[in-house]
């Protein structure tokens, strides 16, 4: 878990949103390898094991990637979410987390993975959390979200709430666009939408069909 990203994480218990306090037992460069995040309101503690923050015992089963991610698909994902700035944090939900190792070579943005597939390691610009019903992320915290298909409503709501004004979300074409987002582009496989933000500007989106 990248230490600066701890500021974006929030307790998942039912109380006012609050930051978490990090207790570090082992670190490598700027990543927490082993430690604890504690809530100052309810005193819940969340362990960090192998760089992964565990927020809930009722975490969905770890996904297994059926096919190796393709570099051209990762390029397409980075372009659709406009991951061009090192100050950005992009959240990859579920199966989209499989693209993180490739994306690290394509974008300077920090990557926060929520419930990624098995075998994805934390570190080197990739941070991982595992949580049950909701994403443990502050409101207005991230610049982009890739939404996995089949997410339950509480998870979708928390992911939308995590978007900054004008931020982008990408989802599979069969997944409905969440309320409050305006569609920017769509093809047979994915859509890209933006959180409504008045006059917030956005660079153009080009979706090209994946090569077979």
Regions found by a protein language model. Give the residues of each.
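Conserved alpha-helix/loop element of class I SAM-dependent methyltransferases that forms part
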Residues: 55-56, 62-106
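A short acidic, Gly/Pro-enriched loop at the edge of an enzyme's catalytic core
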Residues: 85-87, 124-157
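A short, well-structured beta->alpha microelement
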Residues: 72-76, 112-136
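A short helix->loop->beta-strand "cap" motif at the edges of active sites that frequently abuts
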Residues: 107-111, 164-167
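N-terminal auxiliary segments of SAM/dcSAM-dependent transferases
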Residues: 1-68, 72, 179-180, 201-212
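A short glycine-rich, Lys/Arg-flanked "PGG" loop and its adjoining helix->strand segment in the class I
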Residues: 153-169, 174-175
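Conserved Class I S-adenosyl-L-methionine
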Residues: 177-204
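Short, polar loop motifs at secondary-structure junctions
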Residues: 94-99, 112-121, 173-176
């Amino acid at each position: 878990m990248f230490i600066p990203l701890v500021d974006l994480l929030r307790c998942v218990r039912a109380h006012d949103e609050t930051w978490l306090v990090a207790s570090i037992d082992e670190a490598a460069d700027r990543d927490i390898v082993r430690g604890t995040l504690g809530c100052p309101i309810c005193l819940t503690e969340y362990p960090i094991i192998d760089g992964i923050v565990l927020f809930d015992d009722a975490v969905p089963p770890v996904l297994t990637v059926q096919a190796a991610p393709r570099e051209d698909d990762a390029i397409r994902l980075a372009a659709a979410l406009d991951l061009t700035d090192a100050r950005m944090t992009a959240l990859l939900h579920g199966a989209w987390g499989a693209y993180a190792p490739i994306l690290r070579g394509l974008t300077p943005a920090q990557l926060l993975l929520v419930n990624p597939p098995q075998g994805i390691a934390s570190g080197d610009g990739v941070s991982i959390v595992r949580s049950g019903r909701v994403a443990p992320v502050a409101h207005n915290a991230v610049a982009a979200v890739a939404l996995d298909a089949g997410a339950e409503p509480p998870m979708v709501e928390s992911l939308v709430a995590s978007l900054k004004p004008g931020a982008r979300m990408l989802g599979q074409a069969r997944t409905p666009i969440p309320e409050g987002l305006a569609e920017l582009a769509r093809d047979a496989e994915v859509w890209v939408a933006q959180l409504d933000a008045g006059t917030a500007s956005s660079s153009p989106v080009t979706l090209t069909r994946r090569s077979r």
